Each structure stands twice: as structure tokens, then as C-alpha cells.
Design a protein with these regions (language model features):
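Cell-envelope/extracellular polymer assembly enzymes that use nucleotide-activated donors
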Residues: 50
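Short glycine/proline- and charge-enriched loop/turn segments
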Residues: 77-87
Length: 192
């Protein structure tokens, strides 16, 4: 399986410590990217989840970005404005937008009582997030607080059965090298 374009802080061992404090040992972090078949029979049947976390208080999909510089809102809600350290600005697709179909798919497949949410996670230590960005766009250091807020938000709802949720999500996963290769080829043609 391929290596994801991440900074070291997200690595499973480091990230697991962040979840231990909230969940004890009752959580699942998928090791590496996860390819799901969310739209069989269409031109783009698969989607890549950078990181999947399943906790007793929710199923979380993280789209990770190793962008440096300042990240600000754009005039287009599906985009973000990145101002590089050298001052050059460009528009990039928002991780929230990239997660939209993945979140929708998981919500359709899992019991409605299990919360499913996503976030854009910026892992570069050289990133500065504009204060007016949505709260689901966060720096790696903000992850523990974001998770605590999700746990508080979902208090009183049915607890997610972590093992069953993992099994349900992985039913739609393709872990093969061929699957990832075909997905990458389709993704390249989509964004030309």
C-alpha cells in the first residue's frame, strides 16, 4: 500500500495517544489510507479516505493536508486560499469539500444513530489557519480539543459499537495495490 503525504505527527503511534485519553482502548484507527467503493458503476466508483477513526462517540474521516503558509477562506465555499511563505497565493479545494461524498456514503451505510463526521486536518507545523475558517478545518495540535468537542456534542446518543462499525466500513474497502493504482489513474484524469 502507498505511503500518504503526511508529516510525522499523524503517525499511528503518536495519534493513538491522542485517542487513548478520550477512549481508553476502545477505538480504531485505520493504518494508512483506505479506498472505499462508494459509487459502483460510475466513472469514479472509489474514494480515498486519508485517515479513519472510529470511537464510541463517532466515526471520523480526516482529509489530511501538508500545506504550509496561511490558509484562509476563499470567495468560493468549496475552495480555500493558501498564501505560501513566499507570499504567492493560490486557490485549493477545501478538505471539507473533498470529504463530502465520503461522509455521505458512510452515513448511508452505517446506522443513523452513529454520528459520522469529517475534518480537514493540516499537519504541517508551518501552517496558520485563519480564524474565520470552519471549525472542521484544524491544525494537528487542535485535534484533541476537536475530538473532545465532538464527544460532548454527541453525549446522550447511542454509543458506537467500534468493532461492528469497523467491520461495516471495511466491507466497502479495497486494500489491493491494483485498486489504489486504478483509483489514482481515475483521479488524475478527473483533475486535469
Amino acid at each position: 500500500m502507498k505511503s500518504v503525504r503526511l508529516a510525522k505527527p499523524w503517525r499511528r503511534k503518536n495519534c493513538a495517544r491522542r485517542f487513548n485519553g478520550l477512549c481508553g482502548d476502545d477505538f480504531y484507527l485505520h493504518d494508512g489510507p483506505l479506498l472505499i467503493e462508494h459509487a459502483p458503476g460510475t466513472a469514479f466508483p472509489t474514494a480515498e479516505i486519508d485517515h479513519l477513526a472510529i470511537t464510541p462517540f463517532g466515526v471520523f474521516v480526516f482529509e489530511t493536508k501538508n500545506w504550509s503558509g496561511r490558509i484562509a477562506p476563499s470567495n468560493c465555499t468549496a475552495m480555500l486560499r493558501r498564501i505560501a511563505p513566499n507570499g504567492k497565493a493560490d486557490e485549493r479545494r477545501s478538505p471539507i469539500e473533498q470529504n463530502r461524498s465520503k461522509i455521505r456514503f458512510l452515513r448511508e451505510q452505517l446506522p443513523a444513530m452513529w454520528p459520522v463526521a469529517g475534518a480537514g486536518l493540516f499537519v504541517s507545523p508551518e501552517v496558520v489557519l485563519h480564524p474565520e475558517l470552519p471549525t472542521d478545518l484544524l491544525a494537528l495540535g487542535d485535534l484533541p480539543h476537536w475530538l473532545r468537542s465532538k464527544r460532548a456534542e454527541y453525549t446522550g446518543r447511542s454509543t458506537v459499537d467500534v468493532a461492528r462499525a469497523r467491520e461495516a466500513v471495511l466491507m466497502y474497502a479495497d486494500a489491493s495495490t491494483e485498486g489504489f493504482t486504478a483509483h489514482k489513474v481515475r483521479a488524475k484524469t478527473q483533475y486535469r
